[in-house]
Amino acid sequence: MNKIQIIITTSWDDGYVLDVRLAELLEKYNIKGTFYVPIRNYERKVMESNILIQISQKHEIGGHTVNHIYLDTLGKTEANYEILECKNKLQDKLGKNIDAFCYPGGKYSERDVKLVKEAGFLFGRTTNFFHSEIKPVYNLMHTGLQVFDHSSVVLIRHCLKNTFLSPIFAYRFFYKGNRDFSALADMILLKLFKNGGVFHLWGHSWEIEKYGLWKELENLLKGLSAHHEIAYLNNTEYWHFVNNKLIL
């Protein structure tokens, strides 16, 4: 595709008030982020508009529905409202195009994928793990690793969401069933530095706070930073790159 063999992209879901801490941490290590923000979230507090605007100056903002609701539980009319209205409201707040969308809870149907595209989003980000191959992204953008220590059962279940087997083989054989996110990140990066690829790190600031993962995350970001052979992109920049619309 071009000489860049390793890409780092990150994304952060739910628009929680501690996303500002995430943004500052990313900026400390010159790493780009895409923040997927719902208009409202009845589970936890969403950041105020002034903070959202502040974060948007250096990072990408993406849509995450109006009410942070699982789209596959809604009828077509309600799902279309959640998708389209979140885009409109964010664009009104920020005065810029919103191109990226993330499915709350990673829940979606083929209908929802179509609605996301019809609303004018370039893609919908999922929660599927262990994707590291640099290849065109059309409708769905999968991820590499979540900042969370999942059980092996959960990690395998996420792998099984895929319609192809490479993430399952990667987890069982290359990553040897490890469940610690820091150890998994080290193994993924070892593989990337050898073979090239993309590392898409994602998570929730509320979860990082709840489980005390800030130090581990900072250590990881520090290790990811300042490599001349790595391209640091937000999610939409990555989409443009793999679809041959961005030259680095």
Where are these regions (language model features)?
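A short acidic, amphipathic alpha-helical/loop segment
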Residues: R21-L25, N50-I51, R111-L115, E216-L220
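Boundary/entry segment of secreted carbohydrate-active catalytic domains
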Residues: M1-V20, Q146
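Short active-site oxyanion
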Residues: I8, I98-D99, H228
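C-terminal domain-boundary segment and adjacent tail
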Residues: M1-K3, K28-G33, E43, Q91, ...
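Aromatic-anchored helix/helix-loop segment that forms the rim or "lid"
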Residues: R157-D186
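Soluble or luminal CAZymes and related metallo-dependent hydrolases
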Residues: L18, M47, E78-E85, Y108, ...
